[in-house]
Curated annotation (Swiss-Prot):
It is an enzyme of class 3 (hydrolase). The gene is dom-3. Mg(2+) 1 binds at residues 205, 259, 269-270. Decapping enzyme for NAD-capped RNAs: specifically hydrolyzes the nicotinamide adenine dinucleotide (NAD) cap from a subset of RNAs by removing the entire NAD moiety from the 5'-end of an NAD-capped RNA. The NAD-cap is present at the 5'-end of some RNAs and snoRNAs. In contrast to the canonical 5'-end N7 methylguanosine (m7G) cap, the NAD cap promotes mRNA decay. Also acts as a non-canonical decapping enzyme that removes the entire cap structure of m7G capped or incompletely capped RNAs and mediates their subsequent degradation. This is Decapping nuclease dom-3. Substrate binds at residues 74, 113, 144-146, 257, 271, 293. Pfam families: RAI1 (PF08652). The lineage of its organism: Eukaryota, Metazoa, Ecdysozoa, Nematoda, Chromadorea. Belongs to the DXO/Dom3Z family. It catalyses: a 5'-end NAD(+)-phospho-ribonucleoside in mRNA + H2O = a 5'-end phospho-ribonucleoside in mRNA + NAD(+) + H(+); a 5'-end (N(7)-methyl 5'-triphosphoguanosine)-ribonucleoside-ribonucleotide in mRNA + H2O = a (N(7)-methyl 5'-triphosphoguanosine)-nucleoside + a 5'-end phospho-ribonucleoside in mRNA + H(+); a 5'-end triphospho-ribonucleoside in mRNA + H2O = a 5'-end phospho-ribonucleoside in mRNA + diphosphate + H(+). It comes from Caenorhabditis elegans. It comes from the Eukaryota. GO terms for biological process: NAD-cap decapping; nuclear-transcribed mRNA catabolic process.
């Protein structure tokens, strides 16, 4: 069943301000099909996007392709044999889970792997000399789910900038998010409290999940993010017809991590939230991100640990993904409309193999002037290695 539903327009003006509802910029969006793009383009933002009643640009539920696990040594294994299970015998109330416990021994994943694990999955599934597009189910674009979420949520989270590198190889567009200078500076200036709060979510996962053969969670071992369970999906995103009326849709092949499985083998996401999930929660971009992350990989339920300001989970509650938009002030269709515009610009820019570009949202310039795309030499990017490409015809 689809996760799309609820109020098609939302109630965005109450939370995000009337200044977002200025006259539409759609008349300024160029019809660029068949015309060479300049080396640099400022991508206009259409304010009327918030009011859209159009059908969702993702027309249907995503198609499940595969699943895989990554072990502590960062080796990919096909299947779900290492996926964590949700500890459903944990009482939902009167809990006292200290999310700060073990912070000093935290064992995080190091470095930026870019899209290497996604390429490794493709590599393991592909025969030598085969056709790349066949392995990715004839998709046009390969990326992480997180990149899709980041772009979609921009319209309700304008303070967070992003940069995406894009390259076309073997007829496929590969997308990879790069850290902006803003993000790098934010990391450098993290306080001890910032670091501890970013740890809390990982500790929560340890408290409420267990290995397949265990009866109780192991909460004494160091928390690590080096082990993962992830899924692979494909979906079709309608193009922005103002930009490319000749191509109806863009096939997107993407992967994302999933936190755990329930007793029936269904996927679950785990989140923490300060206080209660009251009306205010549904006004903010956090609820939009939660919904995006889950709906893109067909997760039906989100388990939420309700915590204190000091980082102690007192109770658990469950959200049904498909019901979140019904209570929200945001319009999920607007996020998909924005994604469609960005992806259509990329599609139009990368016409032939070896074409490359950077798309960047500079939040300090504002959403009306800060979305820019520029062509770059192909040798600026190394996130799709030649050794990977050489396997395919």
């Amino acid at each position: 069943m689809s996760h799309y539903g609820g109020n098609p327009r939302g109630n965005s003006s109450h939370q995000f301000g009337r200044k977002d509802f200025q006259q539409s910029d759609s008349k300024h969006i160029p019809k660029i099909t068949g015309q060479p793009l300049p080396n640099e383009v400022q991508i206009p933002f259409d304010n009327m996007i918030y009011e859209t009643r159009n059908p969702p640009k993702f027309e249907k539920q995503a198609k499940f392709i595969s699943e895989y696990c990554i072990n502590y040594d960062r080796k990919l294994q096909l299947g779900r044999m290492r996926a964590k299970k949700f500890h459903d015998k944990l009482p939902p109330n009167n809990l006292s889970l200290d999310l700060g416990k073990g912070f000093e021994t935290f064992d995080p994943k190091e470095g930026d792997e870019k899209i290497i694990m996604l390429l490794e999955w493709i590599n393991q599934m592909a025969p030598e000399g085969g056709r790349l597009k066949k392995v990715i189910h004839e998709a046009d674009v390969v990326c992480w789910r997180g990149l899709i979420t980041k772009i979609c949520s921009t319209i309700y989270n304008k303070e967070e900038g992003w940069r995406i590198d894009a390259i076309k190889r073997k007829g496929v567009i590969f997308l990879c998010e790069e850290k902006t200078e803003q993000a790098k500076n934010r990391d450098l200036n993290q306080t001890d409290l910032d670091k501890r709060m970013s740890y809390w979510g990982h500790k929560f996962e340890q408290y409420v999940t267990l290995d397949d053969d265990a009866e109780q969670p192991d909460t004494s071992s160091p928390v690590t993010t080096k082990e993962e369970y992830a899924v692979v999906f494909r979906n079709d995103l309608q193009t922005d017809q103002r930009l490319n009326p000749e191509k109806r849709s863009i096939g997107i092949f993407y992967s994302g991590e999933v936190d755990c499985l329930d007793r029936h083998g269904n996927m679950l996401e785990l989140k923490t939230q300060k206080g209660e999930l009251g009306h205010g929660f549904y006004k903010y971009s956090k609820s939009f991100k939660w919904w995006l992350q889950s709906s893109l990989v067909n997760v039906d339920h989100i388990i939420v640990g309700l915590r204190t300001q000091e980082g102690h989970v007192k109770s658990l509650t469950s959200l049904r993904t498909r019901e979140i938009p019904q209570r929200a002030s945001w319009n999920f269709r607007a996020g998909f409309e924005f994604l469609s515009t960005i992806f259509t610009y990329i599609l139009n820019c990368l016409e032939k193999d070896g074409d490359a570009c950077v798309i960047e949202y500079r939040s300090e310039m504002g959403i009306h002037k800060g979305i820019q795309m520029r062509r770059v030499p192909v040798d600026e990017f190394d996130f799709v290695p030649n050794e990977f490409l050489e396997k395919f015809c």
